Amino acid sequence: MSNAPARSPSPVLTGVFAGPIAGLKYQTPTLSGVTSATGEFQYRADEAITFLVGGIVLGAVKAAPRLNLAQLAKRVDGKLDKLLDPSVTNLARFVHTLDQEGDIESGVTIAPIVHELIGDTPINFSPPVMPMGQGGGGDFADDPTLRQILDRLNATPGVFTARTPRTLCSAAASRNELRRNIRGIVKMTDVRIPLRDGSYVCADVFRPAAPGRYPVVMSKGFYGKSFYHDCICNEADVLRKEEMEDRYFSGNPDGAQYENHETVDTSVWVPEGYVCIRVDARGVCKSPGLQAPFSVQEAEDYYDAIEWAGTQPWSNGNVGLWGMSYLAMAQHNVASLQPPHLKAMIAQGTDSDIYNEALYGGGIFGAGFWNWWWKIWSGNNHCGERRETDWMARALATPFNDPTAYGPNGSIFMRPDMSKATAPVWIVGPQVGAIIHQLGSSETYIRSTAAKARKFDFADAWFPDSYSNKSIAEHMRYFDYWLKGIDNGVMDEPPVRVQVRTGNGAHFVLHENDWPIARTQYRRWYFDARPSGWQNDGRRPNMLRIGETMPTEPARAEYDAHLDLGTPTLAPAGSNDGTPRWSTGISFVSEPMSEDLVLAGYMKVGLWVESTSSDMDVFVSLRVLDEQDREIRYESVVLPVDPVHIHPVGHGLLKVSRRKLDVERSTEYWPVHTHLEEDCAPLRSGEIVPIEVGLNPSTALVRKGCRLLVDIQPYAPAGVPVRAYDKSYHVDAVNRIYTGPQHPSYLQLPIIP
């Protein structure tokens, strides 16, 4: 007999089965039981633990504080990249099907009677390993034993309380839930956020599974918060979206850019200790009410959502906003209302004066973009009949910059009072725009002087780069600073970064303290409406001149204002045929550059113009030709707007009757027009008038030997979405441009020494 003292058992520890999964049987060498309502089980250190349903062994694994179903399949061992393995897919589908309510996002609860009903029924989750290319052993849903089990469970009252008769959970849904379990993510779908008027908006909340209080990253949008885009309105939509999500995380054969349009990827952010919330605006998908984009009510709803998120038990009280395009623009509106829990924003591709920067830029309605956006891009953002205000009709009926329609309390679009937008903001501005965001991002940064801190990136491939590993790391550092209180030096860096494009997608970066860049030199090239003699590309005859010396002789060039618009389409390009848009108007070309020029900032032209009609639309494009007289493509991402043609380096427009300048807002580098009805000045016969046209801020390295090419046209140029076309002053009209000492028409460029 041994005299050694008996070893006392090690302490009992508690673990959690992810989901959570409640009612699951477990056994260790010393303990046994059923997982609790929160998925808890007990074990001792270094023990293996076996999980069962009835007498069916699901698998055994070393006990740990947190376990999930993917760890029970030996071939998978919890690895995210192996979830297509049928052994884990079938196992997860079986367990998920047993949930009483049939809502696995809320966890799985297995009724006690299930174990008795299933008993020791043998079931094979893992088909035999087959030689490569010979399949995986058939569909688990066709397994006769599984069918018998489901028939038995469906016939017994109390096993299932909803979604009856129960069918096998889809493979895609089970894998999607497994991914969240592995990453430690809990998803809550269609959470109702109460609003001040007694209504609500629906949100999807993704939070860390581990207990705690976390900062919130919120987006409130117009496109639908379901996976990738649009709504989930019925069971067919549920299955379709589960399949899309599963394919995205299984190699992404569809080429999806993100989990949800213009919001953060929850699979990246939640594991780093953030709650991510996607909110559907009023009238979108299952949020009741009328759709009213960029309205005061929408901003107030956003305020209420922020305050709700900041006071939830899983929130640390700090809410940040992250979004692109629409989801960026909405941020400035709500920031001007100053919700107390809003602590920082990242707005990428934005506008805060929608009339001037997106809707009626230059006084001409952006028909190509807005019709496409409303009918196509946001056309499936509702369940049933679309519920909306008549904002589009009212916008078309209000072509002037009426502050009652487009001001801080605008009845159509809200223009936020930026002096009240005090939350720290990081703005990412694109250098290529579909009539929106290019000017607006830059102007919004300049107007954000009330913000506690501000940063600005002027970028080329802003949209795809927002989801790059580099951008995610930088944005997370920013929110770590403002939402978690981590002093990581992110705000000690120069606040402005400018990507200077060099052609074919390449660029270099300027790190600056100011935007526009303080050392900018504004140089002028003067138009000369005499033939240049340049042997051009053959597309347009009679190229005219532009140079840094004022021409000594007066000259005039004219062109037809009328063109054939062709067959209209809802695409931003506007039509499939008709007059080629590159062929209209007149063009000015420079001599080869004698030195490299770095362009970065705002551009403008000053023109002396006349028309045989009462008005004229002036579209100006700056392009660059290389030493072989080929146009240089500076953008790194070809826009879907007009993929055949190159987006110009600089682009601007003006309806000439809107030429009156707002002298208080205009600067040396950028003309601002009043667009007030009382300032509208139609042209009189024979009248020659001066105008200034701003070209959206941009960048380019123009190398020695390259030429500048400036197109002046009566309609939207190639590579840019179309605008409204008013036949009343285009048909049979002739437009004229004057140059020379009495009419010094010019191009002004921002040169960085």
Language model regions located:
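Feature for extracytoplasmic/surface-facing segments of secreted or surface-associated proteins
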Residues: 2-182
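C-terminal, loop-rich substrate-recognition/catalytic regions characterized by aromatic stacking residues
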Residues: 461-753
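Active-site-proximal cap/loop segments of hydrolase catalytic domains
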Residues: 183-491, 495
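Short polybasic amphipathic segments
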Residues: 23-27, 48-51, 370, 376-379, ...
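Exposed beta-strand and adjacent loop surfaces of beta-rich binding modules
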Residues: 21-25, 46-48, 200, 495, ...
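Surface-exposed loop/turn positions
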Residues: 47, 199, 274, 319, ...
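Residue-level signal for short segments within beta-strands and strand-turn junctions
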Residues: 28-30, 53, 195, 207, ...
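Non-cytosolic beta-sheet module surface loops
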Residues: 18, 41-43, 195, 609-613
